[in-house]
C-alpha cells in the first residue's frame, strides 16, 4: 500500500504544516513528507524527511 495519500486523494498531508495539493510536490516514500527543499526538483525514492522537507542528500 502506498503510504502517501497523494495518489488517492490528490492531497498529501505531512504533520501539521506541510501539505501537498494536487500532487504538485513529490512525496517522499517513507514518511510522505511532501515538500522538497528549495532547488530540489525530486526526492529520491525512499528518502527520509527531516522536519517538513526532504534532506538535500535525498534529492535527485
Curated annotation (Swiss-Prot):
Keyword Translocase on entry: no
Q: Which residues bind a divalent metal cation 2?
A: 6, 12, 14, 25
- Report the domain of life of the source organism: Eukaryota
GO MF term set: metal ion binding
- List ligand-binding residues for a divalent metal cation 4: 32-33, 43, 47
| Residues that coordinate or bind a divalent metal cation 7 | 49, 54, 58-59
Chain spans, region Alpha = 29-60
Q: Which residues bind a divalent metal cation 6?
A: 36, 40, 43, 59
Binding site residues for a divalent metal cation 1:
4, 6, 20, 23
**Amino acids binding a divalent metal cation 3:** 14, 18, 23, 28
Positions binding a divalent metal cation 5 in this chain are: 33, 35-36, 49
Q: What are the start and end residues of every segment in region (Beta)?
A: 1-28
Quote the SUPFAM superfamilies the UniProt record gives.
Metallothionein
Provide this UniProt record's keywords sorted from A to Z: Metal-binding, Metal-thiolate cluster, Zinc
- State the protein's purpose: Metallothioneins have a high content of cysteine residues that bind various heavy metals.
Let me see what the UniProt entry remarks about domains: Class I metallothioneins contain 2 metal-binding domains: four divalent ions are chelated within cluster A of the alpha domain and are coordinated via cysteinyl thiolate bridges to 11 cysteine ligands. Cluster B, the corresponding region within the beta domain, can ligate three divalent ions to 9 cysteines.
The UniProt family comment states:
Belongs to the metallothionein superfamily. Type 1 family.
Annotated protein name in UniProt? Metallothionein A
- Lineage, broadest ranks: Eukaryota, Metazoa, Chordata, Craniata, Vertebrata
Amino acid at each position: 500500500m502506498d503510504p502517501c495519500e497523494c495518489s488517492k486523494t490528490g492531497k498529501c498531508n505531512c504533520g501539521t504544516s506541510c501539505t501537498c495539493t494536487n500532487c504538485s510536490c513529490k512525496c517522499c516514500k517513507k514518511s510522505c513528507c511532501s515538500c522538497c527543499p528549495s532547488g530540489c526538483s525530486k526526492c529520491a525514492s525512499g528518502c527520509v524527511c527531516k522536519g517538513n522537507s526532504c534532506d538535500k542528500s535525498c534529492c535527485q
